[in-house]
């Protein structure tokens, strides 16, 4: 029998500061991958994480 998909999905978090900031250490955008539980957090995830491109802790938002 086939198993159901489950509640945990893999998501990508992207730095919001890298998109708008022109004065950064290196080109590109900082991204993290993590898992979230669909039932506990149905809306988009936002976490403060370290961005190696900006060299500081910034807000990372979930992207599709």
UniProtKB/Swiss-Prot annotation:
Superkingdom to which the source organism belongs: Eukaryota
GO MF term set: structural constituent of ribosome
Keywords (A to Z) from UniProt: Chloroplast, Plastid, Ribonucleoprotein, Ribosomal protein
Transmembrane segments: none
GO cellular component: chloroplast; ribonucleoprotein complex; ribosome
Main location class: plastid
Stored Pfam families: Ribosomal_L33 (PF00471)
Cell location: Plastid, Chloroplast
Keyword Mitochondrion assigned: no
PROSITE patterns xref list: RIBOSOMAL_L33 (PS00582)
GO BP terms: translation
Record family assignment: Belongs to the bacterial ribosomal protein bL33 family.
Entries under PANTHER family matching the protein: 50S RIBOSOMAL PROTEIN L33, CHLOROPLASTIC, LARGE RIBOSOMAL SUBUNIT PROTEIN BL33C
Protein name, per record: Large ribosomal subunit protein bL33c
Organism in which the protein naturally occurs: Chlorokybus atmophyticus
């Amino acid at each position: 029998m086939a198993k159901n998909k489950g509640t945990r999905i893999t998501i990508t978090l992207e730095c919001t500061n890298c998109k708008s900031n022109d004065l950064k250490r290196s080109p590109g955008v900082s991204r993290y991958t993590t898992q979230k539980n669909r039932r506990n957090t149905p809306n988009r995830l936002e976490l403060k994480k370290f961005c190696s491109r900006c060299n500081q802790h910034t807000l990372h938002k979930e992207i599709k």
